[in-house]
Amino acid sequence: MKKSILTGMIAATLGLFNTANAEGMDPAALKTVYDITRNTAGLMSYCVDKGFLKAESIDNAKKMVAYVAAIPGGVDTRDGDKREAMGREGNVLNDDGKVVALEKEAPQGLQAWCQQADEGIRQGLTSIGQ
């Protein structure tokens, strides 16, 4: 389960920009993508605070959030602030919907997770020309 949580978040980040452009994307799936991007933005702040990343990583995560929020058709953003705050505390939701500490759950270690997630965000932004 530990690996699936973190691998899923990274995969969602990497694949976000391809799936988000899909016409007629299911509203529930779009909300999930948005919630993940908001949680990831909070996690980038957490990683910067730990000294693993630079402030630019937070800016990139915010660009990703803005991109997803602007997808035509309306994105349910109601839980966004809560998801981002959870990330700033170093927490994610696992597959069962429980809040877990990323630091304890990252099989590759927190610093490596931060760097991999940051790279995934950069690649995603590059793929959409930002």
Task: Tell me the role of every PLM-derived stretch.
Residues 11, 29, 103:
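Generic anion/oxyanion-binding catalytic loop in active/binding sites
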Residues 11, 33, 111-112:
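Generic alpha-helical structural signal
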Residues 1-7:
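Bacterial N-terminal signal peptides that target proteins for export
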Residues 7-16:
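Bacterial N-terminal signal peptides
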Residues 56-130:
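Compact alpha-helical subdomains of small soluble proteins
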Residues 16, 34, 41, 107-108:
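Processing junctions and N-termini across compartments
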Residues 22-58:
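Immediate post-signal-peptide N-terminus of mature secreted/exported proteins
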Residues 16-22:
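Sec/Tat signal peptide C-region and signal peptidase I cleavage site
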